[in-house]
């Protein structure tokens, strides 16, 4: 095992420290370390990273003085390193200049870890050590890193030894996807492996699956909420208990009810425990706004309920979230030339021995493989000729959904399923958490989206087959307009050009008579609004979307036999606009648990920050970035909540320090985990970060809101509701848009108030909150829940310092 510390990671790097650990027969038998004099001063960040100093290295030997010793240690072995390319190449180069040729086989523990621990999101040595419980006392010290790499290799060997010999054989067949000679480790374990299969696995068509465990007999919950909480080893909280009591009363008496309660009181247990204790015969369906929260509930509250009360809990998502085994099996028969895809298939083979659900979200770096996943995702169809009829994950999930006691899903899947089959929730209790968010999910049912590049691909195919010259010209014209749309959208040029192009598409499609284009003809010739957007995946596809007129009410999808409980921290919109009305339940019972002012939360309004509506994006982003640099000096977690992707990316580009940014560093779930683990101090987020992600691990969080979260009046749902309210003689801004902005701000405050004694300070930089008439309404509402102060920008550091000293 070799680890080098160097002056840089570039081609001119010089070795400053060497660490070597020797393994024989699965045991560490020797180790060696030495500093090396690079004869040049170290950069400040290298000193900070390694703890080495120029003075110390000045006393160290030259590499020529230790080269023989190093070569003797590594000459006859396999060269193993974490990111072997850097260490092996640098050492080989330095040894070559001293007359020694390093030609050892090379093994990279990074790639092996990626294959055999597919659920991890990061594979740096410190993170792997933390996740696997490997000691790493002094990261970026050569010997310490080499020892940790040795322990990691032993851990990997142990993991491989637990796998069936047949699986190792298949992995070896694909091991040319690994760099260098990393396959040697798998080969050694394979040679020594017995043919006996694990009793925990079942083999089907050469694939190995984890056997499903038997469902435990559920334990009876008490009617006393405090007893159930105590059994979960949690403290009883007064407001949580009050909330649970109200939920219990609503479940006894009300067919449809809405309950509002403040963040941070433990609402999830507050509604689940009363529901589970009362609904002895009926299934409970819980819907949450996002898949992230769905996963979070399964990993946290759901896991505890299973452990303590043996509740049969299942998470149900759309079919595309699951691996389609028939498609994966076919891909294994193909000799794919893409090395990354072959390695991904190796990961999937290992993952199949561990997963019980087949939910692709379990794979840590899934975003890296989006290009390969289109053909592997489940489409919801299962052929009667399937080789995996029993093991099919989507089929299993559907069956579990019918029999489990508590079914957890998300708003998007819920409304889609209800549209197809309202009986999905018949005679069940439906709990909708963050119920106001289901309005957007309902609106999305009316939207239709097409990928422009996919349309172009379809046109190219049709042009090769179409014989009619007139129709050929129409196809060519449509293709030109599609390419023009992409060009105009990417360049950010005149909106008029895009509108003209859409009008041309409307005309061309109305004249198109080619078979296979009927759906697109209907789509482009229908009356309605269209808009272009970029997908938030690694492929950045440009899509065109449209929406139908009118709104779908939740009440129109849910059968009367279903009892409905809507929950949120923010249900009240305004005196003249009711969420119950917007959902189609004007008679719903409404209960409110008063929030009360939180002593651990402060909102700070910056009265002299540049006015966002009169400042260019570039200038405003620079001001925000400069402020963040001042705030980061306090060494506290900073969550920045943006209303615009463009602003977020502009600030990210200007920040000179390492940070996490949505749209750049993985999906929301991964960013949340990395931020909670303290990988980076600053997280820039938008969209789901306002209301769909909770942060509970940090005792103190600084939140920054660069712009008030008003909804875009051109968004389809907002536009429709505004039109409805105007027709009813109401003021769309004061009765809906302003209250919704206040709701979103309150939800933002709740992101970092998830448990008792957690503290947060929120900086609102948009000075409209102190300069506009409506700002008083926002401040008055926030002041009911947190301390609100107004300061100058020059006083920000002082305000943070004061708040920190109160900890």
Region locations from a protein language model:
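Signature of the SF2 helicase/ATPase Hel1-core->accessory helical subdomain module
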Residues: 380-406, 411-509, 571-583, 714
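Conserved motor-coupling elements within RecA-like helicase/translocase cores
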Residues: 398-404, 659-683
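Walker A/P-loop
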Residues: 252-273
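Conserved non-catalytic scaffold segment of RNase H-like nuclease domains
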Residues: 2-104, 118-136, 140
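Acidic, Mg2+-coordinating catalytic module of metal-dependent nucleases/exonucleases
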Residues: 75-85, 89-94, 124-186, 762-764
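Conserved RecA-like P-loop NTPase helicase motor core
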Residues: 608-616, 671-766
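A substrate-engagement module of RecA-like helicase motors
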Residues: 226, 282, 291-404
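A contiguous, basic/glycine-rich beta-loop/short-helix subdomain that forms a polymer-engagement track
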Residues: 380-402, 421, 507-615, 619, ...
């Amino acid at each position: 095992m070799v680890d080098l510390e160097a002056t840089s990671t570039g081609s001119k790097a010089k070795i400053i420290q060497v660490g070597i650990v020797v393994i024989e027969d699965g045991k560490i038998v020797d180790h060696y370390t030495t500093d090396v004099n690079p004869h040049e001063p170290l950069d400040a960040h290298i000193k900070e990273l390694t703890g080495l100093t120029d003075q110390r290295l000045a006393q160290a030997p030259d590499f020529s003085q230790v080269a023989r010793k190093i070569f003797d240690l590594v000459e006859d072995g396999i060269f193993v390193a974490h990111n072997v390319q850097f260490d092996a190449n640098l050492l080989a180069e330095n040894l070559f200049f001293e007359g020694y040729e390093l030609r050892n086989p090379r093994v990279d523990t990074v790639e092996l870890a990626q294959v055999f621990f597919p659920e991890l999101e990061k594979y740096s040595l410190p993170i792997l050590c933390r996740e696997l419980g490997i000691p790493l006392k002094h990261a970026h010290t050569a010997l310490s890193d080499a020892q940790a790499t040795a322990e990691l290799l032993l851990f990997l060997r142990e993991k491989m030894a637990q796998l069936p010999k047949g699986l190792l054989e298949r992995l070896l067949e694909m091991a040319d996807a690994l760099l260098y000679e990393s396959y040697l480790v798998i080969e050694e374990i394979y040679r020594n492996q017995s043919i006996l299969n694990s009793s925990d696995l079942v083999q089907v068509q050469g694939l190995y699956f984890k056997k499903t465990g038997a469902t435990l007999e559920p334990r009876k919950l008490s009617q006393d909420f405090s007893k159930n909480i105590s059994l979960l080893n949690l403290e009883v909280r007064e407001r949580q208990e009050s909330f649970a009591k109200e939920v219990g009363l609503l479940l006894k008496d009300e067919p449809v009810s809405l309950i509002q309660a403040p963040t941070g009181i433990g609402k999830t247990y507050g509604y689940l425990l009363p529901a589970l204790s009362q609904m002895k015969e009926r299934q409970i369906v819980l819907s949450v706004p996002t898949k992230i929260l769905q996963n979070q509930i399964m990993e946290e509250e759901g896991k505890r309920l299973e452990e303590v009360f043996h509740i049969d809990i299942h998470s149900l998502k759309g079919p595309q979230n699951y691996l389609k085994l028939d498609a994966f099996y076919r891909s294994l028969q193909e000799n794919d030339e893409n090395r990354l895809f072959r390695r991904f298939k190796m990961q999937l083979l290992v993952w199949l021995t561990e997963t019980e659900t087949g939910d692709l979200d379990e794979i840590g770096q899934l975003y890296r493989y989006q290009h390969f996943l289109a053909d592997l995702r489940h489409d919801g169809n299962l052929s009667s000729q399937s080789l995996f009829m029993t093991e099919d994950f989507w089929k299993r999930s559907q069956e579990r959904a019918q029999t489990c006691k508590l079914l957890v899903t998300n708003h998007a899947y819920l409304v889609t399923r209800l549209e197809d089959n309202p009986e999905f929730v018949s005679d069940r209790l439906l709990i909708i958490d963050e119920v106001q968010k289901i309005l957007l999910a309902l609106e999305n049912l009316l939207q239709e989206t097409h990928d422009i590049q996919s349309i172009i691909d379809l046109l190219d195919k049709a042009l090769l087959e179409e014989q009619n010259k007139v129709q050929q010209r129409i196809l060519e014209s449509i293709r030109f307009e599609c390419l023009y749309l992409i060009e105009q959208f990417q360049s950010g040029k005149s909106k008029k050009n895009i509108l003209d192009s859409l009008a041309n598409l409307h005309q061309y499609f109305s004249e198109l008579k080619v078979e296979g284009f009927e759906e697109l003809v209907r789509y482009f010739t229908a009356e309605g609004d269209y808009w272009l957007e970029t997908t938030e995946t690694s492929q950045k596809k440009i899509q065109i979307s449209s929406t139908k007129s009118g709104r779908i009410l939740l009440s129109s999808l849910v059968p009367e036999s279903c009892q409905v409980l809507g929950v949120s921290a923010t249900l009240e919109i305004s005196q003249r606009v009711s969420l119950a009305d917007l959902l189609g339940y004007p008679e719903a019972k409404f209960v409110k648990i008063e929030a009360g002012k939180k002593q651990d939360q402060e909102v700070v309004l910056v009265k002299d920050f540049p006015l966002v509506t009169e400042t260019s994006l570039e200038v405003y982003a620079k001001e925000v970035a400069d402020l963040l640099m001042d705030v980061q000096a306090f060494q506290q977690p900073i969550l920045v909540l943006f209303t615009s992707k463009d602003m977020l990316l502009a600030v990210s580009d200007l920040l000179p320090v390492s940070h996490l940014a949505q749209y750049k560093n993985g999906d929301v779930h991964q960013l949340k985990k990395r931020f909670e683990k303290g990988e980076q101090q600053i997280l820039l987020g938008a969209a789901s970060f306002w209301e769909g992600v909770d942060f509970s691990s940090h005792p103190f969080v600084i939140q920054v809101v660069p712009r008030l979260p008003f909804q875009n009046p051109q968004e389809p749902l907002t536009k429709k509701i505004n039109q409805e309210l105007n027709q009813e003689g109401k003021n769309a801004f004061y009765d809906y848009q302003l209250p919704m902005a206040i709701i979103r701000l309150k939800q933002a405050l709740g992101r970092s108030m998830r448990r008792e004694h957690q503290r947060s300070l929120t900086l609102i930089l948009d000075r409209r909150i102190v300069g506009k008439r409506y700002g008083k309404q926002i401040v008055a509402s926030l002041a009911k829940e947190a301390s609100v102060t107004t300061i100058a920008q020059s006083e920000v550091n002082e305000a943070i310092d004061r708040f920190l000293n109160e900890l």
